[in-house]
Amino acid sequence: MTRAIVESIKKRFHELDPCTNSNYSKFKVIHTDLTLTVSFESKTLDGTVVYDLKNLDNASEVILDTSALNIKSTKVNGKEVSFELKPVTPIYGAPLRIPINPNESEIQVEISFTTTDKCTAIQFIQGDTGPYVFSQCEAIHARSLFPCFDTPAVKSPYKFTGHSPAVVTMSGRAQPTDEPNTYHFDQPIPIPSYLVSITSGNLLKAPIGPRSDVYSEEPSLKKCQWEFEKDMENFIQIAEKIVFEYEWSRFDSLVLPSSFPYGGMEIPNMTQLTPTLISGDRTQTKVMAHELAHSWSGNLVTNSSWEHFWLNEGWTVYLERRIIGAIAAAEAKEEGRKDAEKYGEQVRHFNMINGWNELADTCETFDKRYTKLVLDLENGDPDDSFSRIPYEKGFFFLYHLETKLGGIKEFDPFIKYYFNKFKYQSLNTAQFVDTLYEFYEPKGKAEILDNIDWETWLFVSGLPEKPEFDVTLANQVYALVDKWVAYVKNGGELPGDETADFEGEQDMLFLETLTEKFKTLDVKPEIIRLFPEIYPKYGASKNGEIISRWNELLISYGKYSSQDKLVQSFASWLGTIGRMKYVRPGYLLLRKGISHEFALEVFKKYEHIYHPICRTMVKKDLS
């Protein structure tokens, strides 16, 4: 039955990545050399990329992805050749066709190019201390930075060179150089195009561990250092125990300006982080655990196309929660708790509860096509499918497998086997399932796998079956929520502030559970307007997770107007951040809770600060 299951899964997705115009399957990329020169005056990058290729199929041309690039020249084996830039397609850009001799098995292709003002991968801004540029290539924006096989199916070792009057970081290990305004980097581990990155600005660094520095502009450096130095090395050591040794030499991180559209981006050797993590309370360090976990899941072992994005993110959330649970257990052990291991698992489950709530909310509000694990992205934009689905539904699928196969002790050996088997490679969902059988069939567990509902988990939209959670750490939260529900239904004594002992994750669970419960109740706005007085700590919080949930609760049920101070304050906050996790729901909240006109008015006021990816997605949300 094993082969039948795997073969049936194979038939449900595209054999080749549908989100690339390139003919990547005809070549193996031996090595890539990328040089980029930053011009802050023209807000462009001038570049040259050199590919050493092995022709696998007697191909007579190399077809690369480009988007809004100015192609200046192309060479094959050192000789200039003509090229053809095909018409632009709305999502996938313009294919670049370069003729080659089909009889030559190994060739070198060189392209000179310049980015344009339509580049979706880079953003030039004025930083805190001077001009600044950073890139963000996931999912298919690398093609607007340089001509490439823009698919996660293709991985290559790189050498990078950056020229700039300001400090440069790229996706590799810094190499010594005496050349002025020149920075060299080596990446010996093969990486896909979406992990290629360049940042340039007045950057300084501070140590946060024996193999880790944090980079940022000077005004925020000390705050960044404090936020991460307590946990960084512990995170790495625990991850190494779960998977295997960290292979990337150093794990450095870069806290970007506020317009960075994501929580973090797992750039090899230089993880990019949003400044919204610098909350002064270390409550959001799990994002660092998440980005670290990508060093194995996503970076070493990569999804072969964006249709299988869950293989990157589901695994990463799984490893992240294992790391967070292990850290909690270690701290409990230091405090002398006899139930330290049990407590660590309770912490993992508490994070799972928050994850389930996010998954349920996404399944309720998001495009149903994109609430499956394995997607159909033919003629589709991967950015449109970006949500919590691959993260949380992917996690719960892996947790389901862990549970069915016998728990952590039975699943941990598979983790090491899987990541060892596929490191430096890209894979699809069928290969993952095949590897499960390969590992567990000799252990007599094939029947367990046969009974997994693969169809529902992989190809059906919506919420999967809810697992049983250890709610020990959530009970205190639920008790306070129940008091509010009873008060709204029956009146009586007004609940007070019983959140003083809540940890950050408990505060988040309280706010989102209350918001969810109130959907089915007739909550009077006057009650909601008492909340800022009862819970002043939420109104004063600098933590983006709290700010977003707090305002969702108040604006959803308080019947505020656009002129109310609370609404004006939230609208102003949206103009100080660029993280899409907060920005997109924030504008949808203003549209639903205040008015469409007000949401558009606020967006038009601040759209110039947002990254091109974020700007495009909010426009779609509000259209």
From Swiss-Prot:
KW Zinc (keyword) present: yes
Active site: 291 (proton acceptor), 391 (proton donor)
Cited Gene3D superfamilies: 3.30.2010.30, Neutral Protease Domain 2 (1.10.390.10), Peptidase M1, leukotriene A4 hydrolase/aminopeptidase C-terminal domain (1.25.40.320), tricorn interacting facor f3 domain (2.60.40.1730)
Cofactor info, note text: Binds 1 zinc ion per subunit.
InterPro entries per record: Aminopeptidase_N-like_N, Aminopeptidase_N-like_N_sf, ARM-type_fold, LTA4H, LTA4H_cat, M1_LTA-4_hydro/amino_C_sf, M1_LTA4H, Peptidase_M1
Family the entry assigns: Belongs to the peptidase M1 family.
Stated name of the protein: Leucine aminopeptidase 2
Taxon lineage: Eukaryota, Fungi, Dikarya, Ascomycota, Saccharomycotina
Protein encoded by which gene: LKH1
